[in-house]
């Protein structure tokens, strides 16, 4: 992790020396990235940045990581993702090859992110790709890898013999491991080729990246090819620098569901399937039970469906930097991004949807186009007068996005040869008005004026102030389309004081204090104006006419969610760099949470109104420490630990105008036996993420639940009414703290890297046990082997007990995992001509 005071933190709005930064910023360089098979940039820094939670929610090779910085900051009305900038251009983690990344900087607190306005309210991730710099011999770099994966721990389901013993009347004669039938040993490979070079005036870099990834489940394949070229030219004695970049990417994935990649329902069917069911009948057809609801052959779901999704992205970007006079830098950034997606999916006449539901050949097609334009103009003036050093920056930003989408589905095809998604119009359902066709267009824009000033005295006392004035089209029609977002931070380099000159412990010690305000715009447009939509049909003058009804009420007072954050931090370097790190404490108050309030009709046209009302608080501590315990000529050991603690509380659900009828709302779903029920409660005075369900404390002599009701009294199964008022908070799904531990050991030419991380202080809902340990669950034929375990160590669960979500299925979710172990060997390659890179590494 970078801690050098001389390194730069690159921002779209200018640059700052690391030593002058007064905000909470984490930097991870390429040498410290997570090595091995990674899907996107998020996995490169997993466990490397305190306070940054990075998760991979599933094994789908097309899926991306999910990132949350410093807890939860909204209850659903605003955007939650951090702003991602790739070489200063807004983008997504999946649009840059991990092998092409040089460094990642994370701006964590409000004083650092305020200048980025509304899109920086959840933090900013700055991705810097590999660059060609200075006079350099033409170089070619290749790196690649081949990887495989496996299911670390399968659900321990009954096999065929065990199933026959327990349920002899349901023996269908076969012996099928359904998980094995739908899974495989996948092989993935990634190849990255870079060419770079230049002279004192012109530099270039070209990069090609190809990735072929297989998922563990059959028919979950992903293929990606991308390339970029970037040319930088300097002229007029280096006063003018021109940079032009071109990026293109094409993704293709196999699809087993409409609009997506792998259908998770297939795995669910494999786990519930009777292990004595054959895959196929004696006549070669798929073994299906069309009379049983939601009981489907998972192999048929895979092989009686066909589809693919193709995505392309083309990006042009340019940058002009001009220094007309000493200390003055003028910059202009332009980019144009065009995303296209085309998808198609179809099911055959042998698919369960045709056999059971009468949807012969159900198929769908869809496409979208997204165009994003960015222009940003900045002017920065830097001046140093004696012990005083200051800089002033001002700028203007314009961002415009146009999104267009269309989709069609149809069924009622006569055969599998002339219909389907390749010829979707000939199905009968669309002609009969039973299928769907639609389109939409969503234009948005974001305009910002911003400024920043920094001051340093004797490199000892540091001050930064920033201001952004921003308008968003999502708030069009309200009185608050524009917002003002200020920030200020100060720093004190204590080691520059005279009283620290004779101490031998700290090489650098800096105290930071910052405060910043950022805003979150609504996820959806036009929430502040009255909207209409189509409703039901009415019979008027002998004709059925579709009515138009209210869809929302106007609210001219709707505005941004405002996050006000205070950060106090300490950076330190000791004993010649053998010990370094940072400690941060932050407090975030989010005011004006966007929430849907119930309102009377009349006078309102609609019974709900989107408005600002609630308040939420996040507090936390983040610690990063790097130690080099051993360092000599032949052996070096460097170890880095990260720790972050976060507490969250909903302070209020009501505002000065709109009041919530209750101090809570229920949300979330948990599926048991095909039913969906609210599983979470968000309540004033409590943390976000609480599980809400019935609390069981014991079982009776027959294996039936004994509950604790609303009054704390014990109630047996037959007398318990399952009233919502008898539910309790039975856990919380958000970790209270995270930790990471990264080790690098070098012995002569060998090096060993070990990356570990964990999350603690949270619970999970074990849906597998909830569904597969209940004998009465009629929609699931197979069971876990633990179905015969003693509940609370007393009795097996009674067959009288209906499947339900309760506290028995809430478990401790703490984990500690080894992400990566990499062993490397460095060796010298001799070239016939001099090369600045004569050391290569084998892994």
Regions found by a protein language model. Name each.
Residues 733-764:
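Glycine-rich, aromatic-lined ligand/substrate-binding cores of catalytic
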Residues 53-56, 495-502, 829:
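Active-site phosphate-binding and catalytic loops of NTP-dependent enzymes
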Residues 1-249, 257, 315-316, 434, ...:
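Short, small/polar-rich motifs associated with maturation and membrane association
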Residues 222-234, 481-491, 833, 837:
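Short secondary-structure subsegments characteristic of cysteine-rich extracellular domains
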Residues 19, 134-175, 216-217, 226-313, ...:
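Surface-exposed loop/interface segments of Gram-negative outer-membrane beta-barrel transport/assembly proteins
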């Amino acid at each position: 992790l970078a801690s050098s005071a001389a390194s730069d933190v690159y921002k779209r709005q200018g640059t700052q020396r690391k030593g002058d930064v007064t905000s909470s910023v984490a930097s991870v360089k390429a040498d410290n990235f997570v090595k091995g098979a990674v899907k996107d940039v998020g996995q490169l820094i997993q466990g490397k940045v305190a306070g940054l939670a990075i998760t991979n929610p599933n094994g789908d090779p097309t899926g991306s990581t999910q990132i949350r910085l410093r807890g939860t900051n909204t209850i659903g009305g605003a955007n939650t993702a951090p702003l991602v900038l790739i070489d200063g251009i807004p983008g997504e983690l999946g649009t840059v090859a991990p092998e092409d990344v040089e460094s990642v900087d994370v701006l964590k607190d409000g004083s650092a992110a305020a200048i980025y306005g509304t899109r920086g309210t959840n933090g900013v991730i700055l991705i810097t790709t590999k660059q060609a710099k200075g006079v350099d011999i033409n170089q070619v770099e290749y790196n690649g890898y081949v990887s495989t994966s496996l299911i670390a721990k399968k659900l321990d389901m009954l096999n065929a013999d065990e199933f026959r013993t327990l349920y002899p009347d349901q023996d269908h004669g076969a012996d099928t491991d359904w998980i094995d039938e739908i899974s495989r040993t996948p092989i993935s490979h990634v190849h990255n080729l870079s060419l770079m070079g230049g002279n004192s005036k012109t530099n270039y870099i070209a990069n090609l990246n190809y990735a072929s990834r297989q998922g563990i489940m059959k028919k979950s394949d992903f293929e990606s090819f991308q390339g970029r070229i970037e040319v930088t030219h300097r002229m007029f004695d280096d006063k003018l620098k021109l940079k032009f970049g071109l990026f293109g990417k094409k993704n293709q994935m196999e699809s087993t569901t409409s609009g997506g990649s792998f259908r998770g329902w297939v795995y669910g069917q494999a786990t519930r399937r009777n292990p004595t069911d054959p895959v196929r009948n004696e006549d070669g057809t798929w073994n299906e039970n069309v009379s049983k609801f939601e009981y489907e052959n998972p192999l048929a779901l895979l092989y009686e469906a066909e589809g693919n999704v193709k995505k392309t992205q083309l990006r042009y970007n340019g940058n002009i930097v001009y220094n007309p006079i000493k200390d003055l830098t003028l910059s202009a950034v332009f980019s144009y991004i065009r995303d296209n997606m085309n998808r198609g999916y179809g099911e055959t006449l042998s698919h369960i949807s045709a056999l059971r539901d009468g949807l012969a050949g159900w198929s769908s097609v869809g496409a979208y186009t997204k165009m994003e334009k960015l222009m940003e103009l900045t002017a920065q003036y830097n001046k140093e007068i004696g012990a005083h050093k200051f800089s002033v920056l001002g700028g203007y930003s314009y961002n415009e996005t146009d999104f267009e989408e269309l989709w069609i589905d149809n069924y009622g095809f006569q055969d599998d040869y002339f219909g389907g998604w390749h010829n979707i119009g000939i199905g009968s359902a669309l002609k009969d008005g039973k299928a769907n066709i639609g389109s939409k267009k969503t234009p948005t824009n974001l305009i910002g004026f911003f400024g920043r000033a920094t001051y340093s005295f004797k490199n000892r006392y540091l001050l930064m102030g920033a201001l952004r004035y921003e308008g968003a089209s999502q708030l069009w029609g309200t009185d608050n389309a524009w917002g003002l977002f200020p920030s200020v931070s100060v720093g004190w380099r204590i080691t520059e004081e005279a009283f620290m000159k004779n101490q031998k412990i700290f090489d650098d010690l800096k105290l930071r204090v910052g405060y910043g305000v950022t805003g979150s715009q609504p996820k959806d447009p036009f929430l502040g104006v009255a909207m209409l939509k189509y409703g039901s049909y009415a019979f008027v003058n002998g004709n059925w006419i579709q009515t138009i009804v209210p869809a929302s009420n106007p609210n001219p007072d709707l505005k941004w969610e405002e996050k006000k954050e205070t950060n106090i931090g300490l950076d330190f370097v000791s004993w010649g760099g053998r010990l370094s790190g940072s400690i941060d404490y932050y407090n975030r108050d989010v005011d004006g949470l966007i929430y849907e309030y119930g309102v009377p009709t009349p006078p309102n046209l609609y019974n709900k109104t989107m408005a600002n009302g609630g308040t939420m608080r996040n507090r936390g501590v983040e610690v990063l420490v790097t130690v080099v315990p051993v360092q000599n000529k032949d052996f070096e050991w460097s170890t880095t630990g990260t720790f972050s603690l976060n507490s969250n509380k909903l302070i209020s659900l009501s505002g000065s105008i709109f009041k919530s009828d209750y101090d809570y709302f229920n949300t979330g779903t948990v599926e048991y036996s095909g039913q969906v029920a609210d599983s979470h409660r968000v309540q004033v005075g409590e943390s976000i993420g609480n599980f809400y369900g019935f609390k069981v404390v014991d079982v009776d002599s027959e294996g039936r639940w004994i509950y604790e009701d609303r009054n704390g009294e014990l109630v047996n199964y037959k007398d318990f009414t399952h009233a919502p008022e008898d539910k309790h908070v039975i856990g919380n799904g958000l970790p209270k703290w995270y930790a990471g531990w990264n080790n690098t050991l070098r012995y002569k030419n060998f090096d060993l890297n070990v990356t570990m991380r964990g999350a603690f202080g949270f619970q999970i809902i074990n849906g597998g046990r909830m569904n597969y340990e209940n004998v009465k669950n009629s929609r699931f034929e197979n069971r876990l082997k633990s179905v015969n375990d003693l509940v609370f160590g007393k009795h097996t669960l009674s067959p009288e007990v209906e499947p339900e979500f309760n506290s028995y299925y809430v478990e401790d979710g703490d984990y500690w995992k080894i992400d990566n172990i990499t062993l490397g060997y460095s060796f010298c390659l001799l070239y016939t001509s001099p090369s600045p890179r004569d050391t290569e590494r084998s892994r």
